[in-house]
A protein has these predicted regions:
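Conserved serine/cysteine hydrolase catalytic core
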Residues: 190-233, 242
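Gly/Ala-rich beta-loop-alpha elbow adjacent to hydrolase catalytic centers
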Residues: 99, 103, 107
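Conserved HGGG/HGGXW glycine-rich cap/lid loop of the alpha/beta-hydrolase fold
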Residues: 11-65
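Catalytic active-site module of serine/aspartate enzymes centered on a nucleophile-bearing elbow/loop
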Residues: 238-269
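Flexible "cap/lid" loop of the alpha/beta hydrolase fold
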Residues: 108-112, 119-151
């Protein structure tokens, strides 16, 4: 299924987004790896999740086809502010959020700073948490941080990163790699790792009253599975779903199961 993109100005940046389906709004926020974008992260989920709801997917600043670099400040504060401004720009007062990695941390920050604008949260391999046992930084994070170093971006470096996003490397296709390499030259990925404010787990997560579905791949090599424990322990209405033989991209590797799981979670009264 092809999706037609739209453009809107958000805080001075021309922002690409997709708006599919009707009903209660659900906003999908992508991760922060090289070449990431809303469509490249959620291509396998938009059609299924939009069957009963309005699904909105946008590119964060510095990613995909959204103009501009991130403003100065703590990373998740900046992205949370941008997300709320995006909601204002397209006339969405309140939404459920589905966020992967960087997008999960951004979703959490929106809920922390503007809880009245959030219905439910779905967090996959969420950034901003803290591993309990696994050594940090992970191999995946180190490869991301090195992507623009030395001779700069390359297909070999990108492949090395993407292979760590998944358990089954056959799911990383040539078209996906080409799409992400083209976008990667516009990515703000190095800037992200130099910024403060990555530790959302230090925030008052116990204040969140939203129903929250935490999703993790057991073999996640970017944000390890044991990073889910603090979120599960501190967010009062959180539940955890773990996929075996799955990496950092649960929404991609386990797309059919993930779509059914999330749709059921969002549909519950």
């Amino acid at each position: 299924m092809e999706f037609k993109d739209k453009q809107v100005e958000v805080l001075g940046a021309r922002t690409r987004y997709y708006d599919v389906g009707q009903g209660e709004a659900t906003i999908l926020i992508h991760g922060g790896g090289p070449g990431a974008s809303g469509l490249s992260n959620y291509r396998k989920n938009i059609e299924a999740l939009s069957a009963k709801r309005r699904v909105i997917v946008f590119d964060l600043p510095g990613y995909g086809h959204t103009e501009g670099k991130l403003k100065d400040g703590a990373i998740y504060e900046v992205l949370g502010d941008f997300t709320r401004a995006f909601m204002d720009a397209i006339g969405v007062d309140k939404a459920s959020f589905v966020g992967n990695s960087l997008g999960g941390g951004t979703s959490l920050m929106v809920a922390l700073r503007a809880p009245e604008r959030v219905n439910r949260l779905v967090l996959m391999g969420t950034g901003g948490s803290q591993a309990m046992f696994s050594p940090m930084p992970t191999e995946g994070l180190m490869r991301m941080a090195r992507f623009n170093a030395g001779d700069g971006p390359s297909m070999a470096k990108l492949k090395a990163v993407l292979e760590l996003l998944v358990y089954d490397q056959s799911t990383i296709t040539e078209p996906l790699m080409k799409e992400r390499l083209e976008a990667a030259t516009r990515s703000d990925i190095i800037d992200i790792f130099k910024r403060p404010g990555l530790d959302i787990w230090r925030e008052d997560l116990a204040s969140l009253k939203h129903r929250t579905l935490i999703v993790w791949g057991r073999e996640d090599r970017v944000v390890p599975f044991d990073s889910s424990f603090i979120l599960l322990k501190t967010i009062p209405n959180a539940q955890l779903h773990v996929y075996p033989k799955c990496g950092h991209w649960a929404q991609w590797e386990k797309a059919d199961e993930f779509n059914a799981l999330v749709a059921d979670f969002l549909d519950r009264p």
